[in-house]
């Protein structure tokens, strides 16, 4: 029964993405993602929702504003094709992303939890997290390990960036607090 539910969710999600793509409002629609990046982003969101269905949770909804913020944070890495950039460059992108994200978060009454978001080390360099696993089993394992998707999260912002042939990702899940 769980497999049937998972398959149904994946089929419905895929059908919805096809319709939205045709209408110009798809996940990543209007963004600067390449077709390969959009496909990786869709695969990640589908895997997250399949995981949630297996836990008897509602599928999580992608929020366009939150995803735009994630895309802004990954943009300096994509533009330079590096997994390491100056902390100053990343802080600038992070400020821009937070300025976009914060009003939406307040409007929706949500708190957020980041996953695989770039971080700055003691040398003041910003680094990307792990690349997106290529194998489905590894992707499922990563999603289960992140833990926060087990919670009552209702929205997600996510983006991916292809850097030197590898897909890197960042996402932020949001749950209602008010």
Question: Where do the language-model regions lie?
Answer:
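Generic surface-pattern signal
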Residues: 13, 53, 75, 79-82, ...
